[in-house]
């Protein structure tokens, strides 16, 4: 019997030795390659962070990657660092960024996100897919969001912008002061726009599916941490194994809600035969075309597959456009309140566009607002949607002109967008809000490695024009009716602190402020 225990003990000891050797190798991975790198933390601090659930928070902070960028900038095309004990590369060179995002994109089209289309249909969206699966879906969806299609969605989005104005009016009338917490209102506006224009949730449909339920399920899908940080890392690191275990990203309750909602609305439209002017109708048209193009043995199987795919298409707008668009709107209004002279310029531009179009805010008028576009670009520079872009290599990649720098297969890459947007060598006075830095001729080649407002290259945001229309309509209507100012001079640290703005209806004359009348 003791021999059995001895053998088991030796096996356990051997396994521990192998784990220690592997961990030691991982800790020294970049040192062995002679690549400049940030040393990994010691084991006990990592364990403490895991226990206190602070590891993921640190990894998401802009300061985390900005510090590495500043420390190693100029040392080579990229530097190394570690997530737990996993080696990762932080890209430093603009030319290498262009190669990754555009020139050699075929080798870097993986965002490193976990998806499981069989067990978790909503995870199989454009945001998470890779390789040929991503390419096929992108080719199907690109035509649905081309410029001329936006004119079909204009009325739908305009109605939501008008509703935003009514919400602001009612909010101000229901309270004794003129201060509002703007990001809450912006989140509601963006969510309602997506519910109506992407999910087909109009006033009639909201009797069955109230917007409050839609908001609750959206928050559940986006912010519910179904798995802990380590398990999420495992899903990213070993996706095939996790698919065998049928692991999911989307809470089952949220998945059932969105699929049921879309199935109900799509069936109603297909039965009535009345097309609508919204994005859901464009997705239904894509689905109908696929149904004709592909032949399955069972039409029922094809229908279920395409319905789940349609739900994933719609759901990606929530994942990539809800919080991001609402936050950008909040930051734009904050910066304009902080810089009233710029707010006046945007308002005057909107006023002239309205005059040119017979007193109406038209689609053409919205597209002509060049200075507003500069303000949005500068806001996205100072307050980027995400502090970094994540990519993973599909095959080994030798960095041109740098023989010792190899991006090995399955290596995670970080492009530090926040750090690059605040690099004084690229943007002089990076902490100052200067929309006029975007007024000259645009160098698209230069911007490919220095500005990431909506992403770069083939995997840039598919809904750029949709988001731009949402942003511009809201700003045009709000600035046409209100003057925004800060009710505090305290600097904004982040949106979690809240943005409280004071709103003054244009044309209202306060005692001692007669010059504010318009």
Curated annotation (Swiss-Prot):
Q: Which InterPro entries match?
A: Cyt_P450 (IPR001128), Cyt_P450_CS (IPR017972), Cyt_P450_E_grp-I (IPR002401), Cyt_P450_sf (IPR036396), Insect_CytP450_Detox (IPR050476)
Q: Which cofactor does it need?
A: heme
Q: Which domain of life is it from?
A: Eukaryota
Q: Signal peptide: which range, if any?
A: none
- Gene3D superfamilies noted in UniProt: Cytochrome P450
Pfam families the record matches: p450
For membrane topology, the record states: Peripheral membrane protein
What Enzyme Commission number(s) does the record list for this chain? 1.14.-.-
Cellular component, GO annotation: endoplasmic reticulum membrane
Heme among the record's keywords? yes
Binding residues annotated for heme, in chain numbering: 461
- What top-tier enzyme class does this entry carry? oxidoreductase
Chief location bin? endoplasmic reticulum
Molecular function terms, GO-annotated: heme binding; iron ion binding; monooxygenase activity; oxidoreductase activity, acting on paired donors, with incorporation or reduction of molecular oxygen
Q: Which keywords, in A-to-Z order, does the entry hold?
A: Endoplasmic reticulum, Heme, Iron, Membrane, Metal-binding, Microsome, Monooxygenase, Oxidoreductase
Quote the subcellular location field of this record: Endoplasmic reticulum membrane; Microsome membrane
Per its database record, what is this protein's job? May be involved in the metabolism of insect hormones and in the breakdown of synthetic insecticides.
PANTHER family xref list: CYTOCHROME P450, CYTOCHROME P450 6A16, ISOFORM B-RELATED
Family the UniProt entry places it in: Belongs to the cytochrome P450 family.
Q: This chain belongs to which protein, by name?
A: Probable cytochrome P450 317a1
Taxonomic source organism: Drosophila melanogaster
Please spell out the taxonomic lineage of the organism that makes this protein: Eukaryota, Metazoa, Ecdysozoa, Arthropoda, Hexapoda
């Amino acid at each position: 019997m003791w021999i059995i225990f001895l053998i088991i003990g030796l096996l356990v000891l051997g396994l521990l030795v192998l784990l220690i050797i592997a961990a030691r190798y991982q800790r020294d991975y970049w040192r062995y390659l002679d690549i400049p790198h940030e040393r990994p933390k010691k084991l006990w601090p990592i364990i403490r962070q895991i226990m206190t659930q602070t590891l993921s928070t640190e990894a998401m902070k802009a300061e985390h990657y900005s510090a590495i960028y500043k420390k190693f900038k100029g040392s080579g095309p990229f530097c190394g660092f570690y997530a737990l004990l996993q080696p990762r590369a932080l890209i430093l060179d603009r030319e290498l960024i262009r190669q990754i995002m555009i020139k050699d994109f075929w080798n870097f089209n993986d965002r490193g996100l976990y998806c499981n289309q069989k067990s978790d249909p909503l995870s199989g969206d454009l945001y998470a897919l890779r390789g040929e699966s991503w390419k096929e879906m992108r080719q199907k969806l690109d035509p649905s969001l081309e410029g001329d299609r936006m004119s079909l969605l204009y009325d739908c989005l305009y109605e939501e912008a008008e509703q935003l104005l009514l919400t602001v009016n009612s909010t101000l009338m229901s309270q004794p002061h003129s201060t509002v917490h703007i990001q809450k209102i912006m989140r509601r506006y963006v969510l309602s726009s997506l519910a109506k224009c992407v999910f087909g949730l109009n006033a009639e449909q909201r009797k069955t599916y109230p917007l409050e339920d839609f908001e609750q399920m959206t928050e559940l899908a986006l912010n519910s941490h179904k798995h802990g940080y380590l398990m999420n890392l495992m899903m990213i690191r070993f996706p095939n194994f996790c698919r065998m275990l049928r692991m999911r990203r989307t809470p089952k309750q949220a998945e059932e809600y969105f699929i049921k909602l879309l199935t109900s609305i799509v069936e109603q439209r297909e039965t009535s035969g009345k097309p609508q002017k919204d994005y859901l109708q464009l997705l239904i048209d894509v689905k109908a075309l696929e149904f004709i193009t592909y032949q399955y043995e069972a039409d029922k199987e094809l229908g279920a597959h395409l319905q789940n795919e349609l739900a994933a298409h719609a759901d990606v707008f929530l994942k990539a456009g809800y919080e991001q668009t609402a936050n950008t709107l909040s930051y734009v209004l904050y910066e304009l309140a902080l810089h009233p002279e710029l707010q006046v310029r945007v308002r005057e531009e909107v006023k002239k566009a309205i005059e040119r179009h017979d007193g109406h805010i038209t689609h053409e008028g919205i597209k002509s607002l060049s200075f507003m576009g500069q303000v949005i670009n500068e806001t996205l520079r100072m307050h980027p949607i995400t502090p970094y872009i994540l990519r993973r290599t599909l095959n080994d990649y030798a960095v041109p002109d740098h023989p010792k720098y190899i991006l090995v297969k399955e290596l995670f890459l970080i492009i530090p967008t926040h750090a690059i947007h605040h690099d004084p060598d690229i943007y002089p006075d990076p902490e100052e809000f200067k929309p006029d830095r975007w007024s000259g001729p645009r160098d698209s080649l230069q911007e490919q490695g220095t500005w990431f407002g909506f992403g770069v290259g083939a995997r840039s945001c598919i809904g750029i024009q949709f988001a731009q229309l949402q942003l511009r309509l809201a700003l045009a209507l709000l600035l046409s009716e209100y003057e925004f100012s800060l009710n505090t001079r305290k600097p904004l640290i982040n949106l979690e602190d809240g943005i409280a703005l004071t709103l003054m209806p244009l044309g209202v004359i306060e005692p001692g402020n007669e010059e504010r009348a318009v």
